[in-house]
């Protein structure tokens, strides 16, 4: 079989992933909920993953890593938690529904939303993005790569705009985490949301 749907989920996982899942099922207890060896083993394993992810994405600290069920949940928590009525948010037409739907919900609550268009080849104008920033703009929210067209957004360029304008930069890296190098400090990303079952080669 030739499998060509890795952007939806990776099918063939490394043996180490399978072994880790089996070990967790057979040995790990409830993390943070007891003093048994099984519970402590789970807690230590979770923190070890925090450390590895912080190093992988160059986060400031392992304590900046939060685990959720998936990227959709991460984006919903981040976007619905960040914005208040009267805030202004900039996003793009390249976004997945996991970005657009919570932003539409925010819009219904009184958040102003600007959705930037792209040209016929799917490319954005970064000059237009910078010009879209207003006094009440709180964040730029964008994907790193479109799951439909494959177009990629220049995160360094967007991060520079966000830093220059003193606003937050939130990235949906569902398609690119584990595939492309992402340094959140260099790119000035305030929130990076991604899933484990695509480029990170983890379970769904």
What kind of region is each of these model predictions?
Residues 1-204:
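Pyridoxal 5′-phosphate
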């Amino acid at each position: 079989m030739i499998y060509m749907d890795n952007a939806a989920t990776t099918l063939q996982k490394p043996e180490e992933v399978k072994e880790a899942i089996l070990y967790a099922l057979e040995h790990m207890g409830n993390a943070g909920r007891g003093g048994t060896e099984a519970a402590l083993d789970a807690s230590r394993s979770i923190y070890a993953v925090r450390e590895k992810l912080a190093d992988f994405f160059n986060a400031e600290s392992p304590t900046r890593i939060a685990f959720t069920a998936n990227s959709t949940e991460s984006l919903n928590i981040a976007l619905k938690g960040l914005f208040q009525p009267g805030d202004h948010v900039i996003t793009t037409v390249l976004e997945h529904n996991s970005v657009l739907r919570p932003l539409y919900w925010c819009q219904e609550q009184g958040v102003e939303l600007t959705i930037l268009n792209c040209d016929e080849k799917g490319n954005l104008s970064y000059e237009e993005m910078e010009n879209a920033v207003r006094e009440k703009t709180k964040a730029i929210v964008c994907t790193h790569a479109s799951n439909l067209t494959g177009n990629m957004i220049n995160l360094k360029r967007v991060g520079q705009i966000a830093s220059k304008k003193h606003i937050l930069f939130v990235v949906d890296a569902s398609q690119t985490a584990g595939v492309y190098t992402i340094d959140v400090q260099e790119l000035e990303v305030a929130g990076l949301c991604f899933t484990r079952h695509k480029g990170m080669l983890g379970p769904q």
